[in-house]
Amino acid sequence: MLTEKQEAILDYIRSVQAQRGVPPSTREIQRHFGYESQNAAMNHLRALARKGQLHQVDGATWGLKVSEVQGHFELPIYGTIPAGVPSMQEQQPKETITFDPAVFRLRRPERLWGLEVHGDSMIDAHILDGDIAVLERREAKPGDIVAALVDETTTTLKRLAYVKGKPVLKPENARYALIVPKDRLEIQGVFVGLIGRAKR
């Protein structure tokens, strides 16, 4: 069983390794968690290795076990999605990226897909222009951020809300207005994570 700190370190290693393809160095872990020396980080890494969670890549780097790395899969990216004014959704996958669902504690990767964000209507939710929104095909709840098809013509990424019992799409930027569907709103995916590509 892992301690809370060990879980945090393992999650950080997963995140970095998923984004870069290589795990962080011991010094990077030290800086990220604010340790005064590398020894504190090393103690946690050795403990994780004893528990079968990590293996030592070289003298300064500890990575995920091969079995966990092999859990990565190709996340389909279905074109672009506007985070400002809605526009037509592209139907064919634009690209695929190697993705580790364990980063977001997800167990059903076959339900996942991604869309690239364009615009600034979700900046208060820290979703920026150029990021990849990771979405899961499942039922949405009020308050979820969703990819939604509006009136069978336009797709956008917004927060789902209800006004007088009717669904609306709420931006996370005060400069944008609510989107109120005239006829139909189809939830295409629920936002479950972000792969940051934009500069922060």
From Swiss-Prot:
Top EC group: hydrolase
Gene3D superfamilies per UniProt: Umud Fragment, subunit A, Winged helix-like DNA-binding domain superfamily/Winged helix DNA-binding domain
Entry's EC annotation: 3.4.21.88
Name listed for the protein in its UniProt record: LexA repressor
Family to which this protein belongs: Belongs to the peptidase S24 family.
Gene from which the chain derives: lexA
Top-level taxon of origin: Bacteria
Listed GO MF terms: DNA binding; serine-type endopeptidase activity
